[in-house]
Amino acid sequence: MATACKRSPGESQSEDIEASRMKRAAAKHLIERYYHQLTEGCGNEACTNEFCASCPTFLRMDNNAAAIKALELYKINAKLCDPHPSKKGASSAYLENSKGASNNSEIKMNKKEGKDFKDVIYLTEEKVYEIYEFCRESEDYSPLIRVIGRIFSSAEALVLSFRKVKQHTKEELKSLQEKDEDKDEDEKEKAACSAAAMEEDSEASSSRMGDSSQGDNNVQKLGPDDVTVDIDAIRRVYSSLLANEKLETAFLNALVYLSPNVECDLTYHNVYTRDPNYLNLFIIVMENSNLHSPEYLEMALPLFCKAMCKLPLEAQGKLIRLWSKYSADQIRRMMETFQQLITYKVISNEFNSRNLVNDDDAIVAASKCLKMVYYANVVGGDVDTNHNEEDDEEPIPESSELTLQELLGDERRNKKGPRVDPLETELGVKTLDCRKPLISFEEFINEPLNDVLEMDKDYTFFKVETENKFSFMTCPFILNAVTKNLGLYYDNRIRMYSERRITVLYSLVQGQQLNPYLRLKVRRDHIIDDALVRLEMIAMENPADLKKQLYVEFEGEQGVDEGGVSKEFFQLVVEEIFNPDIGMFTYDEATKLFWFNPSSFETEGQFTLIGIVLGLAIYNNCILDVHFPMVVYRKLMGKKGTFRDLGDSHPVLYQSLKDLLEYEGSVEDDMMITFQISQTDLFGNPMMYDLKENGDKIPITNENRKEFVNLYSDYILNKSVEKQFKAFRRGFHMVTNESPLKYLFRPEEIELLICGSRNLDFQALEETTEYDGGYTRESVVIREFWEIVHSFTDEQKRLFLQFTTGTDRAPVGGLGKLKMIIAKNGPDTERLPTSHTCFNVLLLPEYSSKEKLKERLLKAITYAKGFGML
């Protein structure tokens, strides 16, 4: 006891740590032996141990189950078989197969040269070139292959490699040396590592790698987003070594061994929290320009993606901020790597409603990794995190009556705020903030994945938000507009059905007969008065009714609304609302676009109702013929208009202000303008407005002209129409506030949702059209019909679409997505063709001649208006 008291605290602590380390090493060794016994056996065919794979009665299990069982056997100190000499472990065989040539060369090298670089515990650029030169002179690359295999398969060694600073801390080096001493000749399976990890406590885990944070006191201080790895050096090394095919195989095999251990470290050991430099290994591996090659796609890259997905959110954010500083070519290379893996896995498997692509771990992991590259592309682009619309609007009024759930004491299940991606929160940047990414957003869309994705199942996973099921709607950048529109359709329909069920149950509870639909009965000649008055009453009394399915009825007409009547309703409303004579919007002849009239006499309520109509069109999957500049959709999503937006909405003014900014002379002397501008009211009378206080007395100079341009742009796009647009946006959000619209779509895609595609590809329409009632693609009337349609002018083609589908715009994805049906409607007759716009069905009699067919068809599409029952 006296002797123990004389020991210094440092010696005592050192001995305790050493004893603890030896105890853990012994435990880990036993667990690995149990795992090996369960997965490969002892080699004795007559073995009687029920916990040995060589026993004839042993029931086989997968690696994860074996890992858990190994831990249980360790705890009860179960029997261990003696190894049989005739048995060779699978892992050893794999190692020999993958590195057989290397092992033979190693023996020769040791005999011939006696130098194997076993003392290399981490790599630098200089050390790589030294070994490479040695191998080149001896014409034997085995030493370098072994070094690459050893360093690139060890997380601890790779983390220390290619540092910007030459020196490493004593704790790091000591930990790495201990790791090498304890390391077996064969790499252990990932599951065994996981079992050992579950047994170790957090204190033991932290001593496994050493306290790197203390060691950093000896090296240069780094900022929160800085990394210690020398990226340029890594690129030079890869450039030199990857040209050698033997060395490339070494990198490939090392990555196969590295990835499961990294996944284990991140899942169970919280390794990044203890050592942020752990991120270095992901940076190093991702610099390998051959990751997209076929050799990596089968095993190495999927394993690495699974490991990379385990990075905590903070680490992902740091990695994204680093990658955002890369060039567009570097971002594209990484993007193509993950896209290649996703495409390869999609086309090499058969996915359907039973075998979902969502269940493929490699595709899911690659999509999550691709998300990091996507955000790096966003952050590294032209980003504007300012100019956000201040959310100072009054809250949307709730219904004055209790819902069924509230009567029963529950909240409504669907009443959630818009979803926000955690990475956006971590980075402080949204996709909406990016004006121009490093590479285009379209390059991140994976069409083969979209083709096999079961959107109904994916939407379910998106709404449930379970950890077991992955939804690709959480990675909207990888989906095309058609797929996302289908997801939005499911969301809207489910919400409609939910409102319908709630209404029925509410009626039973209250004893009142309520309408399960949003029913609008309008007169065709007074459509604005009837529709807007009715919508205004609903918005004031019970805004939740706006989320019911729309049902339109034209007074005096027999049409039943299965979608087609609603389409015409929206078409007529839009024509009336955007009539310049009403004065709510101004029309620019040059751009063919509408803008809010700052001098409009209409009330805020009228603009709110216009927003409701726009929201209802999206909610009910109807296309509108509206022509807004892109800044309107950006403002709807929450961004204010800036000078750059003027180029689209007010091109003449934009060019004038641009010339002012680029003027090389003296602005004050030559132009003599101030911070006071002139606008015209509804009657053409001039109105003066000061952009700053006493603006008429402040001259514009070369120094303050940028401020003038920004203030002028802000006035035109924001302040002058603030009252009108705020009401418009409020009405839009009354319908879409609980929708994933903002989460899934960019402003450009919102415009596509509302307006449809401007490209009318009638060739695609012909290829996808189906036939019924006796017609086929080869029927004479059908061939003549398409010859006539293709000869139509653009205006006639739009009239034809209006006649058959209820709208003259192509849906999202183009006319090929329309699924039109042409059905035979009797023999030759004088009757005109008719249509079911709800179902995109054209009823076409079998006319006797092509001339008669054209005459009847033109008359039908030119004078078609109104609905009747056939």
From Swiss-Prot:
GO molecular function, one term: transcription coactivator activity
Keyword match Cytoplasm: yes
Biased composition (Basic and acidic residues): 171-180
Class of enzymatic activity (EC top level): transferase
Pathway(s) annotated for this protein in UniProt: Protein modification; protein ubiquitination
UniProt-annotated catalytic positions: 838 (glycyl thioester intermediate)
Modification Phosphotyrosine, positions: 654
Zinc finger (C4-type): 42-81
Gene3D superfamilies noted in UniProt: Hect, E3 ligase catalytic domain, Hect, E3 ligase catalytic domains, Ubiquitin-protein ligase E3A, N-terminal zinc-binding domain (AZUL)
Modification(s) after translation: Phosphorylation at Tyr-654 by ABL1 impairs E3 ligase activity.
Keywords, comma-separated and alphabetical: Biological rhythms, Cytoplasm, Metal-binding, Nucleus, Phosphoprotein, Proteasome, Transferase, Ubl conjugation pathway, Zinc, Zinc-finger
Tissue: Widely expressed. Most abundant in brain, heart and thymus.
Induction field: Up-regulated in response to neuronal activity.
Catalytic activity, as annotated: S-ubiquitinyl-[E2 ubiquitin-conjugating enzyme]-L-cysteine + [acceptor protein]-L-lysine = [E2 ubiquitin-conjugating enzyme]-L-cysteine + N(6)-ubiquitinyl-[acceptor protein]-L-lysine
Modification type Phosphoserine: residues: 8, 213
Documented EC number(s): 2.3.2.26
GO biological process, one term: regulation of ubiquitin-dependent protein catabolic process
Chief place of localization: cytoplasm
Residue segments, region Disordered: 171-223
Keyword Transferase: yes
Subunit structure of this chain's protein: The active form is probably a homotrimer. Binds UBQLN1 and UBQLN2. Interacts with the 26S proteasome. Interacts with BPY2. Interacts with HIF1AN, MAPK6 and NEURL4; interaction with MAPK6 may be mediated by NEURL4. Interacts with the proteasomal subunit PSMD4. Interacts with BMAL1. Interacts with ARC. Interacts with ESR1 and WBP2.
Protein name, as recorded: Ubiquitin-protein ligase E3A
Species this chain originates from: Mus musculus (Mouse)
